Amino acid sequence: MAAAALAFLAGSAAALYYSHLGLALSHYDARAHLVVSRRIFDSIVPGWQQIGAVWLPLPHLLDMLPVQLDIFYRTGAFAIAISVASMSVAAWAVARLVLRTTGSAAGGLTAAALFVANPNLLYLQSTPMTEPLLFATTMVAVMSVAEWVDGDAPRWPHAQVRSAPRIRP
């Protein structure tokens, strides 16, 4: 948990820094993600078809209600908060995976620190992009599979299979 807290603090500081410099929405795709999220409800033909054909839908589904407010749409603040939280979750999963593999708490914290200290990731998580959420979900999946393989979560695959019919459309 210390890794996640430190990642959240570093990510928040980076997000504030890049926002102050006016770089939070400088990437074209950052603005496009906000537009896709907003047009689900606010467009000439609103609907789920507006989610888009290029990107995976989860980030847009998470942002679709908050971006209806102009402050979140124009600044990307809610989507950036999701990115910062996602990188914190990814750092936690990295630390837990290294701790589980090596037995070293210092190694886990170091791995998370190296992950979070990457300047490219610090900038990326300071924008409303989809990659931080991808990193978080991937790292949690890898960590969960490692726990299952080690025998600490023997029912995990069965629970996933049983819940699958409940989440399909």
What is the predicted role of each segment?
Residues 101-102, 141-159, 167:
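Membrane-interface transmembrane helices that cradle and orient dolichyl/undecaprenyl
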Residues 81-102, 140:
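Transmembrane-helix motifs of polytopic, lipid-linked glycan transferases
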Residues 33, 87-90, 115, 130-142:
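Hydrophobic core segments of transmembrane alpha-helices in multi-pass, intramembrane catalytic enzymes
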Residues 12-32, 44-45:
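Helix-to-loop transition at the C-terminal end of transmembrane segments
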Residues 35-36, 40, 50-72:
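Short hydrophobic/aromatic helix or loop-helix immediately within or flanking a transmembrane segment
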Residues 1-15, 147:
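Start-transfer (signal-anchor) and selected internal transmembrane alpha helices
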Residues 7-8, 108-119, 143, 164-168:
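Short helix- or helix-capping micro-motifs
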Residues 55, 120, 126-133:
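Short acidic/glycine- and proline-prone juxtamembrane loop motifs at membrane-interface regions
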